[in-house]
């Protein structure tokens, strides 16, 4: 949450792009008390059927909704399909493998072991 809080403090827009349905994502972000931190949540219900990750549609929809150019966006992803979707959308991707995907070859434009390994300032300086 430090990265999200820092992004919001700098006036940056923050969204979730998920291949899961809104019913799942909205429920869990509300349960965790983080729903209000996001400007938008884009899910499988927001794109054409069969166009979730690794297709770029979720990220393209997020860029359109946020009114952000792909050259000014960053995606944080934990899965190979998500990294591929981000790259296909032309967005810089930071891969942060989770315990399940750590054994897979999840390689973003930048790959880090955890969000704690990178500050927003470090990212903005790249």
Model features per residue range: what roles?
Residues 1-16, 22-26:
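Short, acidic loop-to-helix structural element flanking the phosphoryl-transfer center
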Residues 5, 22, 27-126:
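Asp-based, Mg2+/Mn2+-dependent phosphohydrolase catalytic module
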